[in-house]
């Protein structure tokens, strides 16, 4: 290809030289102006030509021929800056119009009517339905008039109240009115079908509230109030193991609050004690007794009060007949000698007590016992909450008797 280029260039130059020779021969007797013009053409022949006789290798000649006629590439930075540059006339963003606040003179409350298109609706829905969001914000969802009143009575802070019908709001107007003035509770009216979708209950009560979880300060205040009324917590910690049913866990917490126990420990693998069904099963017990949830067996020893760590007794309530045969068990009525603090481990009806619980029992040596409730022939077990009620009040009776003997 390079030879062809040089060949064509040489042929063109030869033709131009021949033309000049003809001009010289014909102009020997011609006028002076024509001869000068021919000489100027000869002098500038290669200077004005588009062809250049430049040293060039084959690779460079092929590259020039391949990319001849193409547009030069635009650097990436210039393209990016051009594409990412702001438009000359950006469209202004229209901020959503906030819903008007409705002042109800009859209830003496202020609320906002939410629609499905309101951005706040999706935010509230995420908070209600997402356990991860609730755990991060340490919030709980409370449904129903009685449970909301119980939470307010125990000093919990109500962030949001949702209602669908005005007559339902009227049932709690006094307590909610105080909360709105003191803590700035926000009240929203939503359609009944939306509230039914958000609720985890089959029959929604029409009232749903978002509360902050009980704080240590609030529990200490409730404890001081119980002591003032003559109700001192007993040195008993109930440890829930493999409790998978929310209603059963709620009933267990309710019994512990009724005794009352020092605290309730919910081990890893149990259901959520702050789930809506567990709260309804607890009937407000979660607001009155300290609860430590999602505790591993390695962390269980840290829940024992430091002042009673040297004299802590551990009891396992075993309902499985086969496990009772493999371990030395005693009748719960034959328990003798309780410690400065006592751990009662109770398992679920389906899975029973785990092997981790027995390994923890072996750590305390002679201060650990496996107990059972004798039942009639043909009856395999009791409901876990019913069994716990029998055991706790028997331990309470023995603690009272033990204290009276020391006096």
Curated annotation (Swiss-Prot):
InterPro entries: Alpha/beta_knot_MTases (IPR029028), MRM3-like_sub_bind (IPR053888), Ribosomal_eL30-like_sf (IPR029064), rRNA_Methyltransferase (IPR051259), SpoU_MeTrfase (IPR001537), SpoU_subst-bd (IPR013123), tRNA_m1G_MTases_N (IPR029026). S-adenosyl-L-methionine binds at residues 347, 373, 382. Its EC number is 2.1.1.-. Keywords: Methyltransferase, Mitochondrion, rRNA processing, S-adenosyl-L-methionine, Transferase, Transit peptide. GO terms for biological process: rRNA processing. Gene3D superfamilies: 3.30.1330.30, 3.40.1280.10. One of its GO terms (cellular component) is mitochondrial matrix. It is found in: Mitochondrion. The keyword S-adenosyl-L-methionine applies. Pfam families: MRM3-like_sub_bind, SpoU_methylase. Residues 1-25 form a transit peptide. Its main location: mitochondrion. SMART domains: SpoU_sub_bind. GO terms for molecular function: RNA binding; rRNA (guanosine-2'-O-)-methyltransferase activity; rRNA (uridine-2'-O-)-methyltransferase activity. It catalyses: a uridine in rRNA + S-adenosyl-L-methionine = a 2'-O-methyluridine in rRNA + S-adenosyl-L-homocysteine + H(+). Belongs to the class IV-like SAM-binding methyltransferase superfamily. RNA methyltransferase TrmH family. PANTHER family: RRNA METHYLTRANSFERASE 3, RRNA METHYLTRANSFERASE 3, MITOCHONDRIAL. S-adenosyl-L-methionine-dependent 2'-O-ribose methyltransferase that catalyzes the formation of 2'-O-methylguanosine at position 1580 (Gm1580) in the mitochondrial large subunit ribosomal RNA (mtLSU rRNA), a conserved modification in the peptidyl transferase domain of the mtLSU rRNA. Also required for formation of 2'-O-methyluridine at position 1579 (Um1579) mediated by MRM2. This is rRNA methyltransferase 3, mitochondrial. It comes from Drosophila melanogaster.
